[in-house]
Amino acid sequence: MKRMITLLYVTALTGCIPLCAQRTASVSLDPETKFQKIDGFGGCGMNGQWADVYTQEQVDLLWGPDGMGYNIMRIRINPDESNWKSYVNAVKWAKAHGATVFASPWTPPYRFKVGAEQTWGESSNHGHINTDSIESYAKWLERYRQFMEDQGAAIDILSV
């Protein structure tokens, strides 16, 4: 029975290949037709807990005038405050190239959540915000915004 199911599966897959291979797609672009405004393109600075997120050369390559032409930088608000400083230089360099910087937390700190685990000193992505902690969480986000501003790396947009 198992062999028969396997044969049927393989037959079904190989039978689709000629059909899929024969299909063609056509795309037409009309620059005069506009559906939405695109503010720009960018990249995300990932985990920065061990070292600075980007070197200046990397920022120049991505956000600089002779680079990729990015104009938006997204960074993660690390739930561990001791890691906030790792994004400062990259934000300063990107902003020097005119980038818009927006920051978003992937998860609130462990102390503001219920049903969560703590891993490596950070919150896991499990659980959810404790409704009793919403005001404290908002103050924590404001503290982050102020920290970055005090470092000369002001955040343009904070997304939750």
At which residue positions do the language-model features occur?
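Residues that line or immediately flank small-molecule/substrate-binding pockets and catalytic motifs
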Residues: 8, 45, 77-80
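N-terminal module-boundary/linker segments of secreted carbohydrate-active enzymes
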Residues: 22-56, 60
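Substrate-binding cleft and catalytic face of glycoside hydrolase catalytic domains
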Residues: 28-33, 65-160
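Generic secondary-structure transition motif, activating predominantly at the C-termini of alpha-helices
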Residues: 9-12, 62-67
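Bacterial Sec-dependent N-terminal signal peptides
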Residues: 1-22
